[in-house]
């Protein structure tokens, strides 16, 4: 493209450039197709910057008002579908500036005074992520409510507890669901911590060294709701720690969702049959008419990989970058945008699954906890209470279990005489101690699955979650 700069994406560059970009390079270089996501935040940041320039006397108050009016006009055009940036704009920042100049003429060219796209994009990204963090927290709270409602419906329902995916000890189903509420609360706490480091303003750091223009960074930070400003301009435009931290925290959210999803998939299988999936949250087979597939938890489990991949991608992208800004940073947007969208979608889907997508099969669960050896530990505890050393009791119960397995019976099938062949301290009250509900009820340690302890936790979480709503 000889004869001067003709590429639209080069219009914001200096006259050092005599030729426009090669069309392929122009497409390769542009980010407008995805960073248009930041339009509202770009307008918010630009309005705060324009007001500050006016208040500091860098431009007149009248010019600042004109700039704000033009930016709000662009917002209105975008809402009406009339603002249509293209490849010619390269990115959202140039798109806004180009339209502003078209609306205001020379005054529009004053907006970028004392600012670089380097601090501008950092500001936009933080504003955008801050809002999405708040949205995600609301979704996670909804998920906790859904889990709690299910738990409250199953105060007395038992479910086998597993270690190594082998039957271990019976649990109160509410206790099992409460465990996920605890996990999600840790996620919410982590994300709140991340939000604190997102909420720092880089605006005014300019390209990397600050600016000679007499701006007021505290002014724009306060106007945009940031807690403080970056103390070092070089760090301000170089930092993407917050994006990594968010993606790491989101990865843990996905881990917790995936663990529950995995359990639901098992529970919904005919081999377990612990839950029934509703028609609204399951799919069928194109070939096998009897199938009802757990697609929701399977997709949640599968989508973990893309979030984990984004975390690895961000770390790999940042690790070798010299200070300050590098074009590599353009690669943070799609990773971050997709992580936010995927995580929120998965939390929402799992909330719906818990709210209306599955029903626990109480009869099947009751039969499951009555047909195994998950009460074996209670025999050992019974013997310990009779004065038998634990390790001796442990070995003795192992021998009893072996005999039962050899004979194809359960512990509850042994007569008192058969029990006493193993130890004379065993009395008639052992059979009561082996009842599944008794096994659960006696787990009275703080945080345990005993019904009284579970009631305490149900009341705690109901009070805690309801207090947020009131």
Swiss-Prot record:
It comes from the Bacteria. It holds the Pfam family Lyase_1. It is found in: Cytoplasm. The keyword Iron-sulfur does not apply. Keywords: Amino-acid biosynthesis, Arginine biosynthesis, Cytoplasm, Lyase. It catalyses: 2-(N(omega)-L-arginino)succinate = fumarate + L-arginine. Its EC number is 4.3.2.1. GO terms for biological process: arginine biosynthetic process via ornithine; L-arginine biosynthetic process. GO terms for cellular component: cytosol. This is Argininosuccinate lyase. It comes from Prochlorococcus marinus (strain MIT 9313).
């Amino acid at each position: 493209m000889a004869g001067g700069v003709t590429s639209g994406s080069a219009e914001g560059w200096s006259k050092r450039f005599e030729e426009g970009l090669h069309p392929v390079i122009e497409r390769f270089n542009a980010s407008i197709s995805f960073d248009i996501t930041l339009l509202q935040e770009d307008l918010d940041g630009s309005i705060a910057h324009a007001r500050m320039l006016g208040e500091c006397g860098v431009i007149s108050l009248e010019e600042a008002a004109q700039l704000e009016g033009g930016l709000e006009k662009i917002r209105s055009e975008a809402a009406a579908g009339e603002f249509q940036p293209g490849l010619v704009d390269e990115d959202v920042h140039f798109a806004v500036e180009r339209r502003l100049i078209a609306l205001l003429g020379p005054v529009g060219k004053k907006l970028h005074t004392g600012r670089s796209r380097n601090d501008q994009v950092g500001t936009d990204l933080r504003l955008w992520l801050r809002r999405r963090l708040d949205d995600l927290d609301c979704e996670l709270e909804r998920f906790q409510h859904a889990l709690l409602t299910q738990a409250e419906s199953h105060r007395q329902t038992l479910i086998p507890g597993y270690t190594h995916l082998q039957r271990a000890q019976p649990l109160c189903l509410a206790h099992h669901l409460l465990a996920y509420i605890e996990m999600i609360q840790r996620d919410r706490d982590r994300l709140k911590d991340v939000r604190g480091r997102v909420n720092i303003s880089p605006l005014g750091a300019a390209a990397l060294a600050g600016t000679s223009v007499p701006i007021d960074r505290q002014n724009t930070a306060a106007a945009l709701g940031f807690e403080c400003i970056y103390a070092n301009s070089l760090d301000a435009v170089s930092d993407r720690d917050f994006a990594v931290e968010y993606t790491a925290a989101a990865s843990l959210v996905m881990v917790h969702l995936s663990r529950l999803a995995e359990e639901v998939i098992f529970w919904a299988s005919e081999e377990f049959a612990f839950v029934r999936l509703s028609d609204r949250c399951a799919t069928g087979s194109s070939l096998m008419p009897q199938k009802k597939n757990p697609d929701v938890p399977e997709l949640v489990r599968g989508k973990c990989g893309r979030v984990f991949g984004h975390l690895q991608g961000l770390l790999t992208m940042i690790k070798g970058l010299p200070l300050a800004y590098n074009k590599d940073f353009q690669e943070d947007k799609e990773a971050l945008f997709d992580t936010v969208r995927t995580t929120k979608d998965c939390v929402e889907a799992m909330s719906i699954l818990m709210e209306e997508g599955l029903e626990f099969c109480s009869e099947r669960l009751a039969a499951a906890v009555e047909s195994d050896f998950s009460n074996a530990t209670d025999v050992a505890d019974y013997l310990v209470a009779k004065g038998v050393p634990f390790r001796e009791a442990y070995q003795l119960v192992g021998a009893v279990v072996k005999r039962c397995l050899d004979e194809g019976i359960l512990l509850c099938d042994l007569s008192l005489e058969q029990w006493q062949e193993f130890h004379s301290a065993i009395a008639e009250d052992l059979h009561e101690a082996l009842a599944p509900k008794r096994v659960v009820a006696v787990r009275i340690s703080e945080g345990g699955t005993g019904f009284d302890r579970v009631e305490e936790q149900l009341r705690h979480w109901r009070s805690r979650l309801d207090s947020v709503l009131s």
